[in-house]
Amino acid sequence: MLREYKTVREIVGPLMLVEKVEGVKYNELVEIETGSGEIRRGQVLEVNGDKALVQLFEGSTGLNINDCKVRFVGKSIELGVSIDMLGRVFDGLGRPRDKGPMIIPEKRLDINGNPINPTARDYPSEFIQTGISAIDGLNTLVRGQKLPIFSGSGLPHAQLAAQIARQAKVLGTDSKFAVVFAAMGITFEEADYFISDFRRTGAIDRTVLFINLANDPAIERIATPRMALTCAEFLAYEKEMHVLVIMTDMTNYCEALREVSAARKEVPGRRGYPGYLYTDLATIYERAGRIKGRKGSITQIPILTMPEDDKTHPIPDLTGYITEGQIILSRDLYRKGIYPPIDVLPSLSRLKDKGIGQGKTREDHADLMNQLFASYARGKQAKELAVILGEAALSDTDKLYAKFADEFEARYVAQREDEDRSIEETLAIGWDLLTILPRAELKRVRDEYIDKYLPEKGE
């Protein structure tokens, strides 16, 4: 039986205080009926004695405390899930945005998910091919990993996200692959780009999109990634699919969290963000992984824009603590016209060693990766030295390394937006680049691999 109250004390911004309530639970779903009969939804944020603080999803515009009816539903927010969600576009609360019919749910799941017993987790160890050399070759993505992309305002992270969503695949398995795409606080233009790109390339058929626009309520933005992950958990653990969850932009999510925290008059932490920002982000990122005995898996690629390109900002800083590495986009590479502008030196995939090698990619992958990384770093140093002292001060070997760095950026890092490179193509480009350097400089690659894979100069 629903409990209905007309005891609204005050409404401030997206918050409503209801008095004289009984048996109300934290996170409980709330329905608010306006004087005109319109139904709005909210969620219980806090309970103190007989008072409940309710957060409104659709905002408080037009509400009158004298004629509002508040009903506490007795359950938390749930998402109706079904395999039919593939190919559909939803808003941040799981309602159809593509003018299609409502989904007939196979079951309804709490969007906060169930915690995974750490002993039930399986270690990520299978290679996911994104078709992007800078990721596949040097910062390999592994099934069940959470690997964020740190971008900056104006950088092409939207195009990169769409490209990964189109191209990602698990090699050597017959399991189905799906993409769940959650967009938070994006513009109409960006939303149209994602939807039209997926439809044009046919990727929409294996994708579920949850889109929260910049003019949608902040509280809806907080629910969006949880809706997406609930859908992903259903597809992974009930339908045995490999699911890649791409979430953009986590900075907008954290801004919404700060906005709601300020409305609740909570004590702010660093730069005004709530003190529980780390814990809140962990409840999202830790829903990635694999479970023993289950075929499905959830791999996460959260994307965030670093305010003022600052890696020490609380959002990238805390994200880096929780996730297993980071891929950093470079403004300098972007100015050179290189797409994707992935800066491979500060980028890192902590699980890359587990997803490469014989039977996964190729036996020479680890050695080649180490050699390319070291050679590019040496080439960057040589170029910096040339700026200070002039090219005449460089040794012949340093000049070769400087040439290697330029070629590496132009041929290995750079690729077309529609270019889907196989791991064999990526490795072949890497070996071809090493022909620029003398064989004596290839100290990180075993001789048998050099004999087997290094092309002759001039081939």
Curated annotation (Swiss-Prot):
Any single Pfam family the record assigns to this protein: ATP-synt_ab
PROSITE patterns according to UniProt: ATPASE_ALPHA_BETA
Entry keyword annotation includes Transport: yes
Full protein name: V-type ATP synthase beta chain
Purpose: Produces ATP from ADP in the presence of a proton gradient across the membrane. The V-type beta chain is a regulatory subunit.
GO BP annotation list: proton motive force-driven plasma membrane ATP synthesis
UniProt KW Ion transport keyword: yes
Protein's gene: atpB
Similarity comment: family membership: Belongs to the ATPase alpha/beta chains family.
Species assigned in the record: Thermoanaerobacter sp. (strain X514)
Database matches in NCBIfam families: PRK04196.1 (NF003235)
InterPro entries linked: ATP-synt_VA_C (IPR055190), ATPase_a/bsu_AS (IPR020003), ATPase_F1/V1/A1_a/bsu_N (IPR004100), ATPase_F1/V1/A1_a/bsu_nucl-bd (IPR000194), P-loop_NTPase (IPR027417), V-ATPase_su_B/beta (IPR022879)
GO MF term (any one): ATP binding
Keywords: ATP synthesis, Hydrogen ion transport, Ion transport, Transport
